[in-house]
Amino acid sequence: MTPEEEAKRLIAEYEAAQQDRRPIRTYADDQAGPDNKLYSDSGNAERLIALADGKARYEPSWGLWLTWDGQRWTIDHSDLQAQELAKGIAAQLRTRSNETRNEKAQKALHNWSIRSENVHGITGTIKLARSSPGIAISHTQLDDDPWTLNCQNGLLDLRTMILHAPNPDSLVTKLAGCAYDQAAPAPHFHQFLTDTFPDPEVLNYTQRYIGYCLTGDVTEQQISMWWGAGRNGKSTLINIVAAMLGDYAVTIGRDILIAQKHESHDTKFVDLFRSRLAVCVELKETERLDASRIKALTGGDTIMARRMRENYWRFHPTHKLLVATNHKPRADAKDFALWRRIHLVPFTKTVEETDVDPQLANEIIANELPGVLAWAAQGCLEYQQHRLAAPKAVVDATQSYKNETDTVEQFLTNCGIQAGPQVAGETSSTAFRAAHDEWCEDAGENPRSHWNKVSAHLKQEGCVNRRVHGGRLWSHVSMPGITQETTQYDR
């Protein structure tokens, strides 16, 4: 139903309910005397507020109206419903004018009805009404219950799995892609899961994770990375889960997660508002994760965003970050806070090209989404009991990934360098730096930034960089291939 049709329906319903077929009466209509608010934008605003109750709200920081469509609140970028409701007030005033016996009052009502339906009258009415407590609303009030999922057949309490009827007072703006039915079957989906996850512990973990994604809870502070070569089911599963979540799932660009010279525009974060799952597809192995950004997006800190030509506004995260990739991006292996968040889920089974069913995801989405949601809801209950303790396969894969990205350790190992209090040798800083820069050139690392990491690591291990005879030495560092004369000092 369009905003115009919805507004006309509301007006018709109200008129039918009035036995005397008079327009909406408010405080303004019941006042007597020359200074009543009957013939004013303020009086019209009160009529609009009464007519729009439970049907239209206004968010001042966005400068946007929201309308109730029977299941959720949706943004009305054109303000059509508010305008139609305001126009309906003019029609109501004309009806009252025709029914008024007092000739003077009839003329005044008729003139005011004409004034009320011109551009200035409609604009004035809407402008006054939108600041009313019954109309104005903060975006922080929208979708503010992290344990409610708005399904096609009602509001699902994720703690009890009980459905409740849609209610405008719930202030939900999102809608899942299917109805909730605890007994809904999904045979093809379950067979797909069995084929994709040969390790039952990883399958159980994945079910709990997707159940966690039904919620707006972010206490896990995690970024999940689904990794593996092509034809392993990860893209198919993501497409199915995203379809099941509907409005609650969004796709984000990889520039949000990858370190760049220039900051991403704040408009990129708007889609994260009240989402439950944010998916990033395919990162390059030459790209480096932006540790600060990932920690900010997974740590529960307030996110600042804005749409184009809009003031900044803030919100708390409700999304879970999920990366699906064939390649592992680079990451700072020494950043404990980052690696505490990363869970690498290996997709190890590759389907033979001749066995690939290109329509599998579409068939499941078309026929089995309620069953997928029932499976995810069970995972949500299990998550609430057991949280997201990672199975051994995920722990091992994540540790292996961390080792691969530990370029400092790779440099020390490849060059045969020993460092620590137990090492008695001293090494020329100049020779050490030259060997380091040569290694960086071969490894594709930036020498300057990587040297800072190496230096910080050595100092953390108890090594000392000291000045000797006009040169510098690294104490407690031993590097083969450097002569005794060079290790004594730099000239």
Region annotations inferred by a language model:
Residues 2-5, 36-39, 43, 77, ...:
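Alpha-helix boundary/N-cap detector
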Residues 5-6, 10-15, 19-27:
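Short hydrophobic short-linear motifs embedded
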Residues 64-67, 72-89:
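Trp- and S/T/G-rich repeat-edge/linker motifs of beta-rich repeat architectures
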Residues 22-61, 94-491:
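Feature primarily recognizes SF3-like P-loop helicase cores of small DNA viruses
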